[in-house]
Amino acid sequence: MPQNEYIEQHIKQHGRRLDHEERKRKREAREAHKISERAQKLTGWKGKQFAKKRYSEKVAMRKKIKAHEQSKVKGGSKPLDESGDALPTYLLDREQTNTAKAISSSIKQKRLEKADKFSVPLPKVRGISEEEMFKVVKTGKSKTKSWKRMITKHTFVGEGFTRRPVKMERIIRPSALRQKKANVTHPELGVTVFLPILSVKKNPQSPMYTQLGVLTKGTIIEVNVSELGMVTSGGKVVWGKYAQITNEPDRDGCVNAVLLV
């Protein structure tokens, strides 16, 4: 073994500390706080260099995410006749242009327009002011900073939701006010079912509230209706369907909605 690998040799012979994994996990969890602290405290040339390094890291990450998203859509094969070679017989009927992106974008557009096709039970709702929606949270050692806000209404955050680091989290969605399921009533069948919420489609108050997943009266939500056994005209099982919230969830403590059929 090379002389400079004495640490690896010691690990192989004696193993690691019993709390090594826990210490490693905590060190990685503290990393975001350390980066935040350095970004706030470093000034002058060091601050500029640190900001430049962080910027390049973020750009690289965005490029990596974009490349990963594009790799999911298979690219069209380049025509072989440009190089002068003849196309084989089994490739003559293949399309050279890639239509996957066009199809996926048209499907997304149709999904966006779906909510507008229905005549909703509540066409008009009462407007909610920002003072009613958000509560100012005082932070800092002497509680003088007031840039944080806490949502006072019920919200939906989804399955894989992870909170941002505390120092960077501007809007807080309390765990006690998060909803995962709704009491959905089918208007034609006259039955009420307790169904899981898939997403918040549109909040009539503001696009920002839609993005935050705020559940207020008149909000269009997508629910999982696979339990109802609904099928399309083509015989396929319907997975998600839109519903409109008809009550005030923050007053009742639950979400009641009417299915849009």
Swiss-Prot record:
One of its GO terms (biological process) is maturation of LSU-rRNA from tricistronic rRNA transcript (SSU-rRNA, 5.8S rRNA, LSU-rRNA). Its main location: nucleus. A motif (Nuclear localization signal 1) lies at residues 15-22. Keywords: Nucleus, Ribonucleoprotein, Ribosome biogenesis, rRNA processing. It is found in: Nucleus, Nucleolus. Component of the pre-66S ribosomal particle. Interacts with NOP7 and RRP1. Interacts with RSA4 (via WD repeats). Residues 1-35, 61-84 are annotated as: Disordered. A motif (Nuclear localization signal 2) lies at residues 51-58. This is Ribosome biogenesis protein NSA2. CDD domains: NSA2. The keyword Zinc-finger does not apply. It comes from Vanderwaltozyma polyspora (strain ATCC 22028 / DSM 70294 / BCRC 21397 / CBS 2163 / NBRC 10782 / NRRL Y-8283 / UCD 57-17) (Kluyveromyces polysporus). The keyword Cell inner membrane does not apply. Involved in the biogenesis of the 60S ribosomal subunit. May play a part in the quality control of pre-60S particles. It comes from the Eukaryota. The lineage of its organism: Eukaryota, Fungi, Dikarya, Ascomycota, Saccharomycotina. Residues 7-35 have a biased composition (Basic and acidic residues). Belongs to the eukaryotic ribosomal protein eS8 family. Ribosome biogenesis protein NSA2 subfamily. InterPro entries: NSA2_fam (IPR039411), Ribosomal_Se8/biogenesis_NSA2 (IPR022309). GO terms for cellular component: nucleolus; preribosome, large subunit precursor.
